[in-house]
Regions:
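Glycine-rich phosphate-binding loop of nucleotide-binding enzymes
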Residues: 179
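Extended, folded cores of ATP/NTP-driven motor/assembly subunits in large transport
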Residues: 1-175
Length: 179
């Protein structure tokens, strides 16, 4: 079982289409737990507030207070992430996208455990090459596998907040599906 834990900063349609060329079968499970607009707004506001607070250290804030002039040095990464959260809030408010928690899992089976492990390594390598962070589950393997079953919404829940456009870009729309 390979689980995607980290996501790239940008997405495009057919983002994970490279998996189709690996030459073996796998089961792709996408579980998206959508948030209503109020809950998504609350979560995004919390993210924005946390990132905005990280722009300046406590020492910088104290120095600004004592000297009564703003410091030119800010954490630009935190500033950019606060701006991203603000842009996400604006997209949510305009109704362009929705937000939710996404869990992507790829299950591989083979009668030979060594072949299954090699297939898992190939899948992990292909996913990581696209800017994701994928892990071959070991300790959490049973929970991850249970989370791939329909109706099991509580096993292997991941917490990254993604919007619906990213979800559409990660959907296996280019794959052949026999059933």
């Amino acid at each position: 079982v390979v689980t995607v834990q980290g996501f790239p900063p940008m997405s495009e349609p057919g983002l994970l289409a490279d998996l189709d060329g690996l030459g073996f079968s796998y089961r792709w499970t996408t579980r998206f737990l959508p948030l209503d607009k109020i809950q998504a707004e609350k979560t995004l506001t919390r993210y924005r507030r946390n990132w905005f607070a990280k722009r300046k250290s406590i020492l910088t804030v104290l120095k600004e207070t004592l000297e009564n002039e703003p410091s030119p040095l800010v954490n630009s990464d935190a500033d950019n992430k606060a701006a991203d959260a603000d842009a996400a809030l604006q997209s949510l408010g305009a109704g362009h996208v929705g937000f939710g928690h996404l869990t992507l899992t790829i299950s591989l089976t083979d009668p030979d455990p060594d072949v299954a492990d090699e297939h898992a390594r190939l899948v992990e390598r292909a996913i990581n090459a696209r800017g994701f962070t994928a892990v071959n589950e070991t300790v959490n393997a049973v929970d991850a596998w249970l989370g791939t079953h329909p109706g099991n919404a509580y096993a292997n829940v991941r917490q990254p907040l993604l919007h619906t456009l990213n979800l559409a870009h990660m959907a296996p729309l280019t794959s052949l599906w026999a059933g």
